[in-house]
Structure formats: structure tokens, C-alpha cells
A protein has these predicted regions:
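Positively charged n-region of N-terminal signal peptides that target proteins for export
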Residues: 1-5, 21
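Bacterial N-terminal signal peptides
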Residues: 6-15
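Bacterial Sec-dependent signal peptides at the C-terminal "C-region" and cleavage site
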Residues: 15-23
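Gly/Pro-enriched, hydrophobic low-complexity segments
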Residues: 20, 93-95, 160-251
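Flexible, processing/modification-adjacent segments and terminal tails
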Residues: 22-45, 49, 108-172, 180-182, ...
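N-terminal mature ectodomain segment of secretory-pathway/periplasmic proteins
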Residues: 35-36, 41-117, 145, 149-151
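A short, sequence-level motif marking secondary-structure junctions
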Residues: 81-87, 105-108, 125-127, 179-182, ...
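Catalytic loop of the DD-peptidase/beta-lactamase superfamily, centered on the K-T-G motif
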Residues: 100, 107, 116-121, 224-230, ...
Length: 257
């Protein structure tokens, strides 16, 4: 439970539909162009374009459903998530544990789970929500981050990736890795914040698919504290759907019987 509550937001938002673009029409990646990307700002702008930043401007809401598994514990469950106008709602259902929910209505954040009950998100947790729930458009990074630093090219699996350290206006730094060929985001390192403290988390994004002109990672694999593996596989992603505004608001406390 500690792991789930600490990484719930990071997993859901970082692996949510990323604002992206239509793939290049050339027969093979223009490596000569990629080689000219020498600054963090240039890479972030190029990545946003490659993943569909133009199409993302037409998106007002996104609703996603996914399967969630924690192999080491033999846990398999379901997850649903809604993002609209910088508001966020997520629900994870795990057999034997129950429902884990988290929400943000644009100002206030809250969480509810079988162990901690219903509570407000404050301090570092709330700052994390505010940072991650905003549009994931790399070209717009200056609205969410105060600093972007190019660390160089790193190997992520079999791919070569630009490593960029992004420092939010509030909260700790994150390192994002962009494939040098596709410019897609393929890994994110961050320290997730939860009710029990801070937990280092590595999230790998893959199985990108074109949805409404945007490239969306349909699979994420997260390594928590270097040992625990959490896999999320999206089964359905829909954009510009009607959203019930009430789901973002903190639930009322049920009277004790």
C-alpha cells in the first residue's frame, strides 16, 4: 500500500496521453537534424512537435482505462483516469486491497484509500499534483519548470536518449529521457511523494500509438525504490468526451453508523 499511494499520481499522470504530433513523413529518421539539437530548449520543443503539440491544442479532456499489475505481489487490477482543464481524477481497483482514489479540482487535491481514509493533499504532495496535472507539452516547459539542463545522451534499453533534468517551480527535479531518433519520451525519473514519504521511481514509456493526432504511450513500466515493478497497460483512451465535473471534487465524509 505504501508503494501504491506514493506513486499513484506519478504513474497515472506521467503515463497519461502526452501532447504530441504527427510522425515525420520521411522514410527514415532525419538523424542529421537530430544531431543539431544541442540545447535542452531545442530538444523539448522538437519533442513536443514530434509527439503532437499541434493536435493537442484541440483536446479539452481525456479519459483513459488501463490494466495494472504488480508481478512480485501477484496483484492485478484496473485503473481509470480523467484529465480536463488541469483537473485530475484517478481510481485504482485492486482485489484484496480495495479502491484507491486521487483527485484535483484545480485548487484542492485529495486522496482516499482503505488504510488512510479520505485526506487532503498538502505540501509536497499537492505541489506534485499541480506540477504533473498540467499539460504535458514539452514546448511549454517554462510554464511548469524553472530550469532545464541537458545532461547528455544516455542509453535507455537499446535506445539512445537525450537526458534532460527539469526542475519544477515547486518540488524536486525530474530527469526526462527522449529517444534521439523519434524524440518520444521513453523514461522519466522522479521522486514520488506520498503520505509515508519520498520514493524514487523510474518510469519507462513504450508502445506509442497515434490517437487523434497525438502519440500516446499505451504501456508504462515503473521501478519503485529500485526493486518493485508496476506495469500499466492502457486499453482505451478517448479525447474530448463529456466529463462529470463532480468527480474532481473531494468526496463528502460518510457519517459513521
Amino acid at each position: 500500500m505504501k508503494i501504491l499511494m506514493s506513486i499513484a499520481l506519478g504513474l497515472a499522470v506521467l503515463s497519461s496521453p502526452v501532447m504530441a504530433q504527427k510522425p515525420a513523413t520521411t522514410k527514415k529518421p532525419a538523424m542529421s537534424n537530430v544531431a543539431t539539437l544541442k540545447t535542452a530548449d531545442a530538444i523539448l520543443a522538437a519533442s513536443a512537435k514530434a509527439m503532437g503539440s499541434a493536435a493537442s491544442e484541440k483536446i479539452t479532456s481525456s479519459v483513459a482505462k488501463a490494466k495494472m499489475s504488480i508481478p512480485a505481489n501477484g496483484l492485478n487490477g484496473e485503473m481509470e483516469m480523467t484529465v480536463s482543464k488541469e483537473r485530475f481524477y484517478m481510481k485504482q481497483s485492486l482485489p484484496g486491497i480495495g479502491d484507491i482514489m486521487q483527485g484535483f479540482d484545480g485548487k484542492l487535491g485529495w486522496a482516499k484509500d482503505p488504510i488512510n481514509g479520505l485526506r487532503d493533499l498538502e505540501g509536497a504532495e499537492l505541489a506534485q499534483v499541480k506540477t504533473e496535472v498540467q499539460n504535458q507539452m514539452a514546448s511549454d516547459w517554462k510554464k511548469r519548470y524553472k530550469k532545464a539542463e541537458l545532461l547528455g545522451v544516455r542509453k535507455v534499453g537499446t535506445a539512445q536518449a537525450y537526458a534532460i533534468r527539469l526542475t519544477p517551480k515547486t518540488g524536486g527535479p525530474q530527469t526526462h529521457y527522449f529517444d534521439t531518433k523519434t524524440l518520444f519520451l521513453i523514461r522519466t525519473d522522479m521522486v514520488a511523494v506520498g503520505p509515508t514519504g519520498k520514493i524514487p521511481t523510474e518510469t519507462y514509456l513504450s508502445d506509442y500509438r497515434l490517437v487523434d493526432g497525438m502519440q500516446i504511450p499505451f504501456k508504462t513500466r515503473s521501478i519503485v525504490s529500485g526493486i518493485q515493478e508496476v506495469i500499466i497497460t492502457y486499453t482505451d483512451v478517448k479525447n474530448n468526451v463529456a466529463v462529470d465535473d463532480s468527480i474532481f471534487k473531494k468526496p463528502k465524509v460518510e457519517p459513521k453508523k
